[in-house]
Amino acid sequence: MNANPKFLSADARVDAAAVAPLPNSRKVYVTGSQPDIRVPMREITQADTPTSFGGEKNPPIYVYDTSGPYTDPDAKIDIRAGLPALRQRWIDARGDTETLAGLTSDYGRERAADPATAELRFPGLHRHPRRAKAGKNVTQMHYARQGIITPEMEYIAIRENQRRAEYLESLKASGPNGAKLAAMMGRQHAGQAFGAAAFGANAPAEITPEFVRDEVARGRAIIPANINHPETEPMIIGRNFLVKINANIGNSAVTSSIGEEVDKMTWAIRWGGDTVMDLSTGKHIHETREWIIRNSPVPIGTVPIYQALEKVNGKAEDLTWEIFRDTLIEQAEQGVDYFTIHAGVRLQYVPLTANRMTGIVSRGGSIMAKWCLAHHKESFLYEHFEEICEIMKAYDVSFSLGDGLRPGSIYDANDEAQLGELKTLGELTQIAWKHDVQVMIEGPGHVPMQLIKENMDLQLDWCKEAPFYTLGPLTTDIAPGYDHITSGIGAAMIGWFGTAMLCYVTPKEHLGLPNKDDVKEGIITYKLAAHAADLAKGHPGAQVRDNALSKARFEFRWQDQFNLGLDPDKAREFHDETLPKDSAKVAHFCSMCGPHFCSMKITQDVREFAAQQGVSENDALKKGMEVKAVEFVKSGSEIYHRQ
């Protein structure tokens, strides 16, 4: 991508579609033990139940909100200035970091001094980068292992609970039937958490700051939060917490601009992206990343080898440890929260891919495989892994240990190359934990349904319960254009089995670079998969939103049905295609069945008839059938009648 004349930093504006509040929703904040712990949630208001159905109050539902200040009407949004440094005071108070005089990476200094990039550079506040003081470790894992509950951990505990207790109390206080209503709306099917006996899959009824600390200390969860990304709202990735999703964005050599990528980021978090990976491979990667980080309230991940490759003009064999090291420092000083590093692609595994249908499909994996073969040497990522850990813990960058040998077709699933790399990732995890560096493990890929659980079981065993982060997996290879669905099936399954974060797949997978519409489609599909996994695991409170929507559906509260859904806009659009009038929003039927065949309307009629007759619903059904039988005989006992 050349300097795009359509993007000038002086003209940059936030995407208007990303800042509009969702229908019947407002941003609320829950305050923690200190005033600056203000945890955002989305409050969805509901209409009262119609008097014909009992006329009760329906209190607001609270849902997890990843949109940051963008959907807060009281926030002043200026992407040229960036977001407020929410965590800055917490970082300062710990007293274990130092502010550097300037950038220390060679490339970072070059870009800052290059007049050719001046019109593209982020113009807002340029903070001096921070780094751990000599001899200090500033990772959330280190604090957790010292028994310290950080403000980030308290923030996360409040966020994960989603005000569920307050919601149930408001139901109890709603009227004479409040206790019964709370019991009904809080009801949840028992889940099945796989591996609970052998591994710690056991979320408590209420998430506490101490529970967060303990899970991070054990390595079962990570809090990606670089000290140079103070704008981020703390979140957690771990299988005893809500399943999270990641959205990939990024330019390429042939398409997109900085402005488009910032728009994709704000669009992705509006619809529920918990983290965003900037996978840019075109020019101006450094400047694009700075704009994204300074405006992102969610953790940002990257694959540093992509930018390192650009620095050697795309020739993998010219890569060196020194170039890669400088790239790590450059990105850590900008504020990247987690790095995908393909240190498990070892020379000995490359020949194992020779008999594959689709070979090595990971870009990072193929880069390192080519380097290993060109030099006939062990990967410099593997050889220098301890040094990488030293860099990571100086900034609190988390590892996302890359699956460079993941299968690119179901034909190649669970083969020797994939599983050999997974074992190595387990060994590297132990090394990282020795440095108190946070780790998650990346997983496949393309895997048929019957082989998915094996992936999860082996990962838990070999990687000692480090969080699993998977791309799908795609369960079939026959649906280009629909791979958000082929992968959504696998994502729901592996999330149920224990995966902590799901990397979204858009309809453009294997076909092209996703646009904003594709990003939304991928996000919604994966929010659905993650939620289905939470339900299947029996995660506390996971069913509250389902119950609220089902109640709204039964009571024909159409607007509430739309607003409680993952995509209110699409739900309303589909309803309006056949019933566009406002009167249809209060009708006791929809266009699918019409007024005479609506099953829920028939059920309501039965209940009304039962109340009028003073009998139970079962007796009412029996009595109603007797009346209809008499009518049938009187009409001549004919099944069909000519009109």
UniProtKB/Swiss-Prot annotation:
Signal peptide: none annotated. Zn(2+) binds at H446, H510. It catalyses: 5-amino-1-(5-phospho-beta-D-ribosyl)imidazole + S-adenosyl-L-methionine = 4-amino-2-methyl-5-(phosphooxymethyl)pyrimidine + CO + 5'-deoxyadenosine + formate + L-methionine + 3 H(+). [4Fe-4S] cluster binds at C590, C593, C598. Pathway: Cofactor biosynthesis; thiamine diphosphate biosynthesis. Substrate binds at N248, M277, Y306, H342, S362, R363, G364, D403, G404, L405, R406, E442, Y469. InterPro entries: ThiC, ThiC-associated_dom, ThiC/Bza_core_dom, ThiC/BzaA/B. Its EC number is 4.1.99.17. Binds 1 [4Fe-4S] cluster per subunit. The cluster is coordinated with 3 cysteines and an exchangeable S-adenosyl-L-methionine. GO terms for cellular component: cytosol. It comes from the Bacteria. Its cofactor is [4Fe-4S] cluster. GO terms for biological process: thiamine biosynthetic process; thiamine diphosphate biosynthetic process. One of its GO terms (molecular function) is zinc ion binding. Keywords: 4Fe-4S, Iron, Iron-sulfur, Lyase, Metal-binding, S-adenosyl-L-methionine, Thiamine biosynthesis, Zinc. Pfam families: ThiC-associated, ThiC_Rad_SAM. Belongs to the ThiC family. Catalyzes the synthesis of the hydroxymethylpyrimidine phosphate (HMP-P) moiety of thiamine from aminoimidazole ribotide (AIR) in a radical S-adenosyl-L-methionine (SAM)-dependent reaction. Homodimer. This is Phosphomethylpyrimidine synthase. It comes from Burkholderia pseudomallei (strain K96243). The lineage of its organism: Bacteria, Pseudomonadati, Pseudomonadota, Betaproteobacteria, Burkholderiales.
